[in-house]
Amino acid sequence: METATLVAISISGLLVSFTGYALYTAFGQPSEQLRDPFEEHGD
């Protein structure tokens, strides 16, 4: 394969991996440990 194709596939894979990890952190098991500043600050 060409170098440009491998670079494009690598960057795309990293982007998909980062997005998946971000979604897992936001909505998965670790999300229970996140604090909600809006709930802490009652008006």
Swiss-Prot record:
Coiled coil stretches, renumbered: none
GO biological process, one term: photosynthesis
Annotated compartments: Plastid, Chloroplast thylakoid membrane
This protein's UniProt keywords: Chloroplast, Membrane, Plastid, Thylakoid, Transmembrane, Transmembrane helix
Transmembrane segments: 5-27
InterPro entries, per the entry: PSII_PsbN
One Pfam family named in its UniProt record: PsbN
GO CC, one annotated term: chloroplast thylakoid membrane
Membrane topology type: Single-pass membrane protein
Similarity section: Belongs to the PsbN family.
Function per UniProt: May play a role in photosystem I and II biogenesis.
Name the UniProt record assigns to this protein: Protein PsbN
Gene name in the database record: psbN
